[in-house]
Amino acid sequence: MANESLLLTIAVLGGTGKEGKGLAYRWAKAGYRVLIGSRSSEKAVTTASEIMQLLEGSSSVVGTTNLEAAGQADIVVVTVPYSAHRETLESVKDALKGKLLVDTTVPLMPPKVSKVHVPAAGSAAQEAREIVGDDVEVVAAFQNVSHKHLLEEEEVDCDVLVTGTSKTARSEVLKLVEAAGLTGWDAGAIENSIVVEGLTSVLININKQYGSKHAGIKITGASQSS
């Protein structure tokens, strides 16, 4: 993992947000070169500096625009709200050709965020696939992980379900899940992302009903040991 991380650059679009910042921190800590992308390069530079301070300058984290980040990266991760999903992807799609796109977006529709919303494409990930085209492998992951856990050193009590356009692409993202200190599961084709995205609204509802803040999911009855 360490050798591979030194060879790859990850762009986190919308990386100034809580989810993006947390993932960027985890990957930078694991040794990846990380680019923080944002519509505002100034905000991206500030967030990158904050992450570098947390890591005591031991990793490479750089802030720039979404387009610049996408163009320089090997793997591009989208961590924007659903309201900015299409606009963000449209703005960088030419820079994504031949690359791996990881979509963390959940199609939440405020104020009814505890109710599952199904986009016309079936899911946010399938919508992303329609926007970026067949030259881009699209994988959906990290939708159910609370951002709060990502900036903490303690173990994250939530598994990651990974769906995507090919098994090879899903395998690559499972490596990123592991690098972030999480447990990932190959959950199959990208069409299955509709279920994974919907679970986020279910978890939000559970948080409200039971007074919790960071409900997550765990896969039981299966083993990853070889």
Per-segment meaning from a language model:
Residues 105-152:
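Rossmann-fold NAD(P)-binding glycine/threonine-rich loop
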Residues 159-226:
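Active-site-lining helix/loop region of Rossmann-like oxidoreductase modules
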Residues 2-53:
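NAD(P)+-binding Rossmann beta1-loop-alpha1 motif at the extreme N-terminus of oxidoreductases
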Residues 63, 137-143, 185-187:
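General beta-strand structural signal in soluble alpha/beta enzymes
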Residues 55-60, 64-100, 104-112:
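Rossmann-like NAD(P)-binding element
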Residues 6-9, 98, 157:
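Phosphate-coordination loops involved in phosphoryl transfer and adenosine-cofactor binding
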Residues 81-84, 144-145, 166-167:
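Short beta->alpha connector loops
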